[in-house]
Structures are given as C-alpha cells and as structure tokens.
Regions:
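A short glycine-rich, Lys/Arg-flanked "PGG" loop and its adjoining helix->strand segment in the class I
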Residues: 502-516
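Active-site "cap" helix and flanking loop/linker of ATP-utilizing ligase/carboxylase catalytic domains
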Residues: 255-275, 281-282, 291-350
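ATP-grasp fold ATP-binding core
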Residues: 124-125, 148-170, 189-206, 211, ...
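Conserved beta-strand signature within the Rossmann-like core of class I S-adenosyl-L-methionine
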Residues: 517-524
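A conserved helix-loop-beta module that forms one wall/lid of the active-site cleft
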Residues: 99-167
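Peripheral (often C-terminal) accessory segments that flank ATP-dependent C-N-forming ligase machineries
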Residues: 317-434
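ATP-binding N-terminal substructure of ATP-dependent carboxylate-amine bond-forming enzymes
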Residues: 1-109, 141, 389-390, 400-413, ...
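Conserved ATP-binding module of the ATP-grasp superfamily
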Residues: 130-132, 154-157, 171-206, 236-242, ...
Length: 564
C-alpha cells in the first residue's frame, strides 16, 4: 500500500485522510513544528492538533525534524506517491519535499509567487494582468513615504505571508493607516511569527469572490465559486460574516472565471487545488490573493458533496492520480445541486461565556448541516472578533431551496445582533424578584381568559388544584403527548439556576407542543429568565415559525405568538 503525505493536516484538508484510504493508499500526516516560540505559535499548533479529533479514520502521524534535510530523509523513506499541503502553512514544505523527491507538484521556482502576496501581484503585472499596487514596508515612515508618493487614499494593510483575513486592516485615510501599522508591527501573524514587514496596497472596492480551481499538469477546471460577505470593525479589521455558493453565473462572473484561469497560468500553478480570492469592481475582476490548498473553513466532505457532488480533496487527488477522471469532470457543465452558506460567528465584545445555546438552536434550522463551536467547560474567554482567528466557530447551512438557506441565515444574523446570549451566553441575566401571590393570580386569570380558545397546556413551577387543565413541570414535558390550542409558560424559580443553553432548549421543546393556529403565552415573570429576556424569547418563537401578535391592553406584560 503506497503512502500519501499530507503536510499540516487542518481544516478542510482533513478530508484528505478518508479520500486517501478510499484509493487504497495509506494516509500519513506530517505535522510541522511551531513557527516560533511565541504563545501564538503554540496556540496555532494546538489548534492543528485539535483538528485530528475530527478524523474518523486511521492514519500515520510523523513530525517535522529540526532540519529540512532530516525531514526530507524521513519522508523519502516512506516512498510517497503524492505529497500535498493540508492547509496554507503546509504549502512551502510540501512543495519543497515534492520537488526534491521528483513527484508531481508545482514548480519550486514559482513558490514565492504562490505564497507571498506581493510577489503574486508582481507576477501578474509581468504578465500584463490586472494587479493591485502595493509595497512591502518595514517601518511606519516607509509606509508614509509610499502612501504620499502614490497619492493613495484608502489602503489595505496585511502580512506578506498569512491566510484569510488574519492581520488585515482596512484604513480609510493616512491617520488610520499609521495607527494600524503601530498596532501590527507590535504583533504576530497567524502563525505566531513577529511581523517585521507588512504589505501596503491600494484598496479595491467591490464584491469579493472565491473561485476554487483544480489543476492537472497546468490545465484548470472550476470546482466551486463562492461569494464573501464581510464586515469592517471599528478597529479596521475585516470580519467574515458569511460565504454563499454561486450556483448560477451572474453578470461579470464568467469574466471572473476567465481571469482566474489567467492568474493560475501566470503564477505557474500545475497541480492541485487553487483557492483564489478576487474582487469585482467597475473595472472588472482583480486578484486579492491565491492559496494552493483546499478552501478553508472546515468544510467537511458531506457538506461539499451535497452542494456540488464532489469535494476538493478528492478532486485534488484526481489531478495527481487520475487525470482521465479530471478531464472528464472538466468537460461537464458547472452545476451545483444545493445552496450552501458558511456563517461565521461574530463576537461583539470580549466575553467569558458559560454556555452555547446556539448548539441546540442550530439543530432545528431546516437547512442546518453542522454547528462547529468548541464545547464550553465551566467557562471560556472569547475575544471580540477581529478576523477569522477570533471567530469562535461556524454554522454550516445547505438546502436545495435558496430561500430556506437565506431565511435561516437571517435568523442567525438577527441572533448575533439582537440576542447574542442565545449564541454564547455569559449567564448574566438578572432573575427578578417575584411577588408570588400577585403573579400566581395573574397566571390563573390568564388561564381563565384562554379557556374559550380550546385546549390548554400549562408548563409551570406551581401546580393549581383549582384549574381543570393539563399541567406539567419542565421535567414532565417529555411525557406530554399531542398538541394544544394554548400553551402558557410559568417557569421562573425552577430555571433560575439553569444554564442558558438548557433554558433555550426547554423553550424550543415547549413550543413544539403548540398546534398549528394555536398560541404560545410567555409572561414577563418567565421571559425575564430567558437569555436576552423578551428579545431572546421573541427570537426563539420567530425561529419556530410563530407570528408575534399585538399585545392586549390591560393584560399583564406578556409575549403572545401564534403558530403558522
């Protein structure tokens, strides 16, 4: 059985492992050393290792040696069939190893052009392709000189070698540029290496796309096209909001694909995946950056297969091992079978979260494929989101109906903006003091008002002997069969010390007991205990396809909603 080596197996690159096994080969992960002795570099390595938990297959694991020569000798003994990078930081080492072992790969002379952002654009300019003006600077003074000499206005600052939007700053003027440079020159890149040089580029305004290509001996084909939607933070960071698939080409997008082919040719890319990020403005398409590895974002094979009937790592192996299959796929028209969205979670401020209600909420979305957030033990600190590294996780949506995907996406975005405690909860909601006599009388009065409307379920902490309706506490909810015309929730003391994750799950379970056309009634004495209070309760009922009804004059404060 031949070995196939995956250098730095992370994110979507994890899919390589099963694909290698499916080709009757043995997967070998080559784990790279930390890029430096900084805390950030150690955290990056820890993140790489945590990704192994997502691999449900057997593989061999080897480690980079102290010198390149030792690493090369170790890999040579494996007699590998192919060496591929599993993520961006594995591209350089994988390319060097494959070249030195005379394996199919991208030419070593093009390594700078496919890994260093400034070199990419130099190569495009040399080939008379549209590129972005920019310069590598090593000081704030050098950046100011370049800014003034080029008569720049808005600029983008980014590390020369990094990935996604890590370390990227968008600056509206010189003052913002200077401030961002001072911050970045005192920081590290995505791999924990100190930033002693930065790339200053003119800003291109437009719509941002990804064109994923696959290359076989310099011939390219499209696998998927995505559109990015980002948000600029107050600090100038560039935050991913969501990515969506392009299922049919719109105006200007065919030209984008042609330009992507030209870029791959100019950079001398011969084999494997080409993850290219582009902008389209009034002048047409222009490259932002290209990465010779699979699309990131932890896109699992089942998610991608449902969207396009293929996934990149499998198609990548075709480009090396099965060129006939590659060329057969290349002749097929571009067709996606479902619409996909990757929603990145945006944390609005530094928080210490104690639970993640979104874990349970997300499962109820009709287009939900997966929610990827680390399990919170006791509590976990999350930084305000500034880039992809400070996003705590992602939600994956896929459905044949685009309207359903976008509806679920808008719900998730509304949670972020209006009821973030339903995403990551600090468990800080105040449990109001309740006048037992007053509120219990209110509950009985509400029940009596509801009797003309049909069957009633009371989910309650306190049972009422004088009410002839079905009553249950939270623990007994699983034993309730059937659906009711009216469901009234009277829970407060019993949920006061529960996690927001459990409270949200309990409310969702209760909402399922309401008939179509029936109503849910949540008084203030209950919704005060729900994450984000009334807004959180409203978000959950809207999520379950309830219509929020007008409040009724003279009734106690209450959320009323009807099931559609």
């Amino acid at each position: 059985m031949r070995n196939i080596v995956v250098v730095q197996c992370k994110s979507t690159g994890i899919n390589y492992i099963q694909d290698i096994i499916d080709r009757n080969c043995n997967p070998v992960i080559l784990e790279m050393n930390a890029f430096s002795d900084t805390e950030e570099a150690e955290m990056h390595l820890k993140e790489v290792r945590s990704g192994y938990n997502l691999i449900n297959a057997d593989y061999d694991l080897i480690y980079e040696k102290d010198t390149y020569e030792e690493t090369l000798e170790m890999v040579k003994k494996l007699d590998p069939l192919v060496i591929v990078p599993g993520t961006e930081d594995g591209v350089i080492l994988a390319t060097k190893l494959a070249n030195d072992l005379n394996l199919l790969c991208n030419p070593i002379e093009n390594l700078d052009a496919i890994t260093l952002k400034n070199e990419m654009h130099k190569r495009l300019a040399e080939n008379n392709l549209r590129s972005i003006r920019g310069r590598i600077v090593t000081s704030v003074e050098e950046a100011i000189e370049y800014y003034d000499s080029q008569h720049l206005d808005e600029v983008v600052i980014k590390p020369q070698y990094s990935f996604c939007s890590v370390g990227v700053r968008i600056c509206s003027n010189k003052e913002e540029m200077i401030k961002s440079l001072h911050e970045l020159f005192n920081s590290t890149n995505a791999y924990g290496t100190e930033l002693d040089e930065l790339l200053i580029q003119e800003r291109i305004r437009g719509e941002e796309y990804v064109v994923n290509l696959m290359s076989c001996n310099g011939v390219h084909r499209v696998t998927t096209i995505w559109k990015y939607h980002k948000i600029k933070t107050h600090e100038g960071g560039h935050v991913y909001d969501y990515d969506e698939t392009i299922n049919e080409l719109g105006i200007g997008e065919a030209e984008l694909v042609e330009y992507a082919y030209d870029v791959a040719d100019a950079l001398g890319i011969k084999y494997g995946p080409v993850h290219g990020e582009y902008m389209i403005d009034e002048k047409g398409p222009v490259l932002i950056e290209v990465n010779c590895r699979p699309h990131g974002g932890n896109l699992d094979a089942k998610f991608l297969d449902r969207i396009s009937g293929q996934h990149e790592t499998d198609s990548s192996l075709d480009s090396y091992l099965n060129p006939d299959k590659f060329h057969q796929d290349r002749q097929m028209p571009y067709k996606l079978y479902a619409h996909g969205v990757l929603k990145s979670i945006i944390v609005p401020k530094d928080i210490t979260a104690k639970s993640s209600p979104l874990q349970n909420i997300g499962k109820n979305l009709k287009s939900h494929h997966r929610t990827l957030i680390g399990q919170i033990e006791d509590s976990q600190f999350f930084l305000k989101t500034q880039d992809i590294e400070t996003s705590p996780g992602d939600i994956y949506l896929v459905h044949e109906d685009k309207n359903q995907v976008m509806k679920d996406l808008e719900f998730l975005r509304s949670l972020e903006q209006r009821a973030f405690q339903l995403v990551l909860s600090e468990e800080t909601h105040e449990n109001a003091n309740i006048d037992d006599l007053s509120y219990l009388n209110d509950i009985k009065s509400i029940v009596n008002n509801l009797k003309p409307y049909g069957t009633i379920l009371l989910v309650t902490d306190t049972f009422f002997d004088d009410l002839s309706i079905v009553q249950t506490d939270a623990e007994g909810l699983d034993k309730i069969d059937g659906e009711f015309d009216c469901v009234l929730i009277n829970l407060n003391k019993s949920i006061a010390n529960e996690s927001d994750e459990k409270i949200a799950a309990l409310l969702l379970k209760t909402l399922k007991t309401v008939k179509v056309g029936g109503g849910i009634y949540i008084p203030k004495t209950t919704y005060d205990h729900i994450p984000n209070g009334r807004l959180g309760a409203e978000a959950l009922v809207k999520f379950m396809n309830f219509k929020i009804e007008l409040p009724v004059h003279k009734l106690p404060r209450m959320l009323i909603a009807s099931k559609r």
